[in-house]
Amino acid sequence: MTIQTATLGYPRIGKNRELKKALEAFWSNQLDAEALLKTAQDIELQNWQKQLEVGIDRIGIGDLSLYDSVLDWSIRFGIIPERYRSFTGLEQYFAMARGKDGIPALEMTKWFDTNYHYLVPEISEAFQPTDFSDFLETVRRAQTLLGDRAVPIVLGPLTLLRLSRLETNLEQAVSYLRDRYLILLRELKNLGVVEVQIHEPALVLEEADSFKSFYQSTFDTLRQANLPLHLVTYFDDLGAAWPWVMELPVTCISLDFTRGHNLALLKEYGFPADKQLGVGIIDGRNIWKIRPESVLSTLETIQSITANIRLHPSSSLQFVPYDAKREVKLPEPLRDVLSFAEQKLDEVVLLARVLNSNDGTNREILMKNPELTAIQAQWKAFEQFSPVNPTVQARLRNLSVRDLERPLPYEQRRTLQPTLPPLPTTTIGSFPQTAEVRQLRVKLKRHEITQAEYEAAIDEEIAKCVRLQEEVGLDVLVHGEFERSDMVEFFGQQLSGFAFTEHGWVQSYGSRCVRPPIIYGDIARPQPMTVREFKVAQSLTDKIVKAMLTGPVTMINWSFTRTDIPRSEQAMQIALALRDEVADLEAAGAKMIQIDEPALREGLPLKAERWNEYLSWAVDAFRLAAGVAKPETQIHTHMCYSEFGDIIEHIERLDADVLSIENSRSNNETLFQITDAGYRHQVGVGVYDVHSPAVPSVEQLVQQLRTSVANLAPEQIWVNPDCGLKTRHWEEVIPSLKNMVEATKTIRQEVMQSKNNA
């Protein structure tokens, strides 16, 4: 039986971030809608052509999005909240994504356990009419180039519901969507597609079993389209849902064999003879080449159970960059073992070709393939190249529990820490980076300016930022982070064991792209990383300047990590480096140090049974970094896009003096969770959404702060934006901060009056 190949999605931003540039030009009225759509279609066409050239048999299409594919499907199914219905077309689309005219955007949160963000649909009874026209047109264009290889990718109905905020009865919502999905599938059948991928990653969640009846009734309805359905899951295993998922009326079921325990489940339960198994064997979320021996072992086991398989990446390839061959400045032993999207296509095709060209799957025979032998040799060369640091290894071996503890408990530390006005105001750390600031880094990289000239220019930006914060009236200042291209990249560039790409961009959300570092060896800090800029800022003001660090867990979760040692060990190596930085900042006069952990929660395994293991080492890594701080030094941390209710005990164990939170876009849910848990430490309540260009009014901010005061003791509360301000423009930031300070003054007076009346 010939083994076919498939893809489940592809990078969306363009090899040179063409979509990002087009979006930002469109938002600044420098590009019209027609040109924006043309850019997106050109990227789509290039993606299809590449997959066709490589020889992929079933090419997933329709996943490219101007901002977010969940938003795309929300609009197609008429899930449009009333506040956006006065807009139409792209104006409506981007109002939902970014907010407009004082109307807030949809809530944004992380896509499962990845660093991609999606916009949370709000489902009420008032559905708008469906409109699949853009998707159907995409399918037609794909068929023109790809013919029967074109396979539409559709976000599954139960995953769409699971990701949504339901404001109606679940059964009604399922019934509505079920009928409209059937309409869509019939439209696709009329176009002559050979199959449709229904992406249901929600099936790997623990609660999937409770949706069993909904899945069964939904797929019983969808089968009426008489169209082959390919059920796609990824990010983890099916768990307890395995037996009934195998009985769903679909022709192919795809599973992720790079995460979770699907291989063990396959051994236990077998696989139905009437279905094809989609084998997600190439890791769609990391950037390393396959380990031939390991991959062939897995495939040997799978084929001993079912011969009817197709091969594909474990997930969409949107989580990896385009092409590792472009990274010519990386050391050759490292570059040779990298696999970005284009290389992963090659790996899928290679494995299928090797299996199809051999009689049977004996590993010894298969491993004689010259291409697989070459990959083995590349891995051996890399292992000799990858740095090992004996000092770091010794420090890890000698760690004790005392290294993870602050000298005094929180209640005693607080009395020693700086005294500030009630409800002190601050920011999360970064300020807008203009084109001129970004150009400074480019000039330095090209050796067009010296390091001294670069630092002098950065110092001017710091001085301007400090003056601005003083003029606005903030209580605790920051230096603005103008020297940092990215909160992870900046630190990684100064740590041994990290490597950086030139073209390794991936989408975080909308037009925001990041270049995750690559961890390839032991991590150490050769010299201080942030002390110089902190000292410059603190010398310019009598107010406290908060020093800014990125935490070890966020650096792990936002990097492409090693696969030869546990992530926990890599996190502790980073924590040791940050621990030394905290000590140096204290010695330089820092009274407040923020260790950001915005990605703490996103690293949670999708199944709660594995949470404690992750949270144990994640919290320990933070505590190791912060534990060196003196009791009079106030340690802050920041978390965004987080639901805290189910991990609050672990957040408390971080033992941070001040926790700042994303809050405004989640309708205060985060605030309420912290309140319900009886959290005792100080909380920086995110009072406005920095991901929207809208400037919050004083009245809006006053109402937000009143909610905070109603839920937390005033002496617990700090006032800050939701997140860093780097991606905003100065003309948005300045009035927003002024309004925030003005609103805080109003609330301070109300709190004082309330105390006097008590």
Swiss-Prot record:
The protein, known as: 5-methyltetrahydropteroyltriglutamate--homocysteine methyltransferase
Residues involved in L-homocysteine binding: 428-430, 481, 596
Family as reported in the entry's similarity comment: Belongs to the vitamin-B12 independent methionine synthase family.
Lineage start: Bacteria, Bacillati, Cyanobacteriota, Cyanophyceae, Acaryochloridales
Gene3D superfamilies: 3.20.20.210
Enzyme class: transferase
Catalytic center residues: 691
Residues the entry annotates as binding 5-methyltetrahydropteroyltri-L-glutamate: 17-20, 110, 512-513, 558, 602
GO molecular function: 5-methyltetrahydropteroyltriglutamate-homocysteine S-methyltransferase activity; zinc ion binding
Residues that bind L-methionine: 428-430, 481, 596
This protein's UniProt keywords: Amino-acid biosynthesis, Metal-binding, Methionine biosynthesis, Methyltransferase, Repeat, Transferase, Zinc
